[in-house]
């Protein structure tokens, strides 16, 4: 690695949580499955909806409102609500069901075990530096049991 400027001592360290401290892919897959199961429970008449349908709703919403991509929770919630209305559900009911489905997603999304190696690293770094978590996602540091390391 080449440094073109003198490297000064660190004053703090920031982490993007997803795929840095743990493998996020399987976590999101499980969370999406939990959301699908909740939708099936709450709206059985709709049946099991292809995950590609929800991805298309997200892409459509991002085209209409590119800024929504910066709030992934809102983006997912609004895309589910939009998808449900397109499938024939009334707006009010779609909003309520989307909220409950997103809640299932969020709970499952935060239901993971951060590897011991990440805990050890964070503990050692937190003893020397202020640590900051940066994410555009919706991981809950308390539910992940890593909030004690961050400011």
Question: Where is each model-derived feature located?
Answer:
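Active-site neighborhood of HAD-like aspartate-dependent phosphohydrolases
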Residues: 2-56
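Substrate-recognition element of Asp-dependent hydrolases with the DxDx(T/V) motif
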Residues: 13, 97-111, 118-150
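Hydrophobic (often cysteine-bearing) scaffold residues that line and stabilize catalytic clefts
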Residues: 24, 28, 72, 76, ...
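Residue-level signal for well-ordered alpha-helical scaffold segments within enzymatic catalytic domains
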Residues: 30, 34-37, 82, 86, ...
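Hydrophobic alpha-helical core bundles mediating ligand binding, dimerization, or RNAP-core interactions
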Residues: 31-39, 54-58, 76, 80, ...
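Short helix-capping segments at alpha-helix termini
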Residues: 40-46, 86-93, 148-149
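Short, flexible, glycine-rich and Lys/Arg-enriched loop motifs at helix boundaries
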Residues: 46, 62-66, 140-147
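A metal-dependent, Asp-based hydrolase signature
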Residues: 56-103
């Amino acid at each position: 690695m080449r440094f073109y400027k003198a490297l000064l001592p660190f004053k703090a360290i920031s982490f993007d949580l997803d795929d840095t401290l743990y493998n996020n892919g399987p976590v999101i897959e499980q969370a999406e499955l939990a959301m699908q199961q909740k939708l099936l429970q709450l709206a059985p008449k709709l049946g099991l909806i292809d995950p590609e349908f929800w991805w298309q709703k997200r892409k459509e919403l991002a085209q209409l409102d590119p800024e929504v991509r910066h709030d992934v929770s809102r983006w997912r919630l609004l895309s589910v609500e939009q998808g449900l209305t397109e499938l024939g559900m009334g707006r009010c009911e779609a909003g309520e069901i989307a909220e409950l489905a997103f809640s299932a997603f969020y709970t499952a999304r935060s239901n993971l075990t951060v590897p011991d190696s990440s805990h050890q690293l964070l503990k050692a770094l937190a003893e020397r530096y202020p640590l900051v978590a940066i994410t555009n996602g919706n991981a809950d540091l308390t539910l992940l049991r890593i909030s004690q390391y961050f400011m």
